[in-house]
């Protein structure tokens, strides 16, 4: 049975960049764990803001967060109130100084993490899984995705036996290194159990060493 390598790990250093950018000899394990906790905290705090990516950079004890979001207004707040509150909460919890940069995602329909979370939300609201998959696939294609593949795994429609269903439209060349493949994963917590949602979106081919 063929196994699939993670599309980001497969392309790291070639046309994908690391989402944590720093180096430390002595504190490496502590920083990795702290990065995980920072992402978890920010994701929980801004769960309604459509966060697709949280990048972390470190320099001289200061942490810089780069948040890619579909709703920058919610993250920043009126006159920057929300972003200041987030910075204060992070400083209090992690005892570090934080700088926060917010980038707007212009086309959330072709951002795989947001697409996966959208499908998961629909499943939690008891929308039929096939309808949720087909709706998001057609929307992604409409907004310029060259190909998209969606899989849902678990007790679909409340079935006794868990299974995996998938739907694909267009090309999704996972083994082509120069292909710009975006990958997202989300979980739908339904009354029957957890349903895993995976989304691969092919956005086109990149030139040699061009970073997506």
Swiss-Prot record:
PROSITE patterns: KH_TYPE_2, RIBOSOMAL_S3. The keyword rRNA-binding applies. One of its GO terms (molecular function) is rRNA binding. GO terms for cellular component: cytosolic small ribosomal subunit. Residues 38-106 form the KH type-2 domain. It holds the Pfam family Ribosomal_S3_C. Keywords: Ribonucleoprotein, Ribosomal protein, RNA-binding, rRNA-binding. GO terms for biological process: translation. It comes from the Bacteria. InterPro entries: KH_dom, KH_dom-like_a/b, KH_dom_type_2, KH_sf_prok-type, Ribosomal_S3_C_sf, Ribosomal_uS3_bac-typ, Ribosomal_uS3_C, Ribosomal_uS3_CS. Binds the lower part of the 30S subunit head. Binds mRNA in the 70S ribosome, positioning it for translation. HAMAP family: Ribosomal_uS3_B (MF_01309_B). PANTHER family: 30S/40S RIBOSOMAL PROTEIN S3, SMALL RIBOSOMAL SUBUNIT PROTEIN US3C. Part of the 30S ribosomal subunit. Forms a tight complex with proteins S10 and S14. Belongs to the universal ribosomal protein uS3 family. This is Small ribosomal subunit protein uS3. It comes from Nitratidesulfovibrio vulgaris (strain ATCC 29579 / DSM 644 / CCUG 34227 / NCIMB 8303 / VKM B-1760 / Hildenborough) (Desulfovibrio vulgaris). The lineage of its organism: Bacteria, Pseudomonadati, Thermodesulfobacteriota, Desulfovibrionia, Desulfovibrionales.
């Amino acid at each position: 049975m063929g196994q699939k390598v993670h599309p980001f790990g497969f392309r790291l250093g070639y046309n994908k960049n690391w989402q944590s950018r720093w180096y430390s000899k002595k504190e490496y394990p502590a920083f990795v764990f702290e990065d995980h906790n920072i992402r978890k905290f920010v994701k929980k705090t801004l769960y309604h803001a459509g966060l697709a990516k949280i990048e972390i950079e470190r320099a001289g004890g200061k942490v810089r967060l780069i948040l890619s979001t579909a709703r920058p207004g919610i993250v920043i707040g009126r006159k920057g109130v929300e972003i200041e509150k987030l910075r204060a909460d992070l400083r209090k919890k992690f005892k570090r100084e934080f700088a926060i940069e917010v980038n707007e995602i212009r086309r959330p329909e072709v951002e795989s993490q947001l697409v996966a979370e959208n499908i998961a939300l629909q499943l939690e609201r008891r929308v039929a899984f096939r309808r949720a998959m087909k709706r998001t696939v057609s929307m992604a294609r409409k907004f310029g995705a060259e190909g998209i593949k969606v899989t849902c795994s678990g007790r679909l429609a409340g079935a006794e036996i868990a299974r995996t269903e998938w739907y694909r439209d267009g090309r999704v060349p996972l083994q082509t290194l120069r292909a710009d493949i975006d990958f997202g994963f989300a979980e739908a917590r339904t009354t029957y159990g957890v349903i895993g949602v995976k989304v691969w979106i092919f956005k086109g081919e990149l030139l040699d060493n061009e970073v997506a």
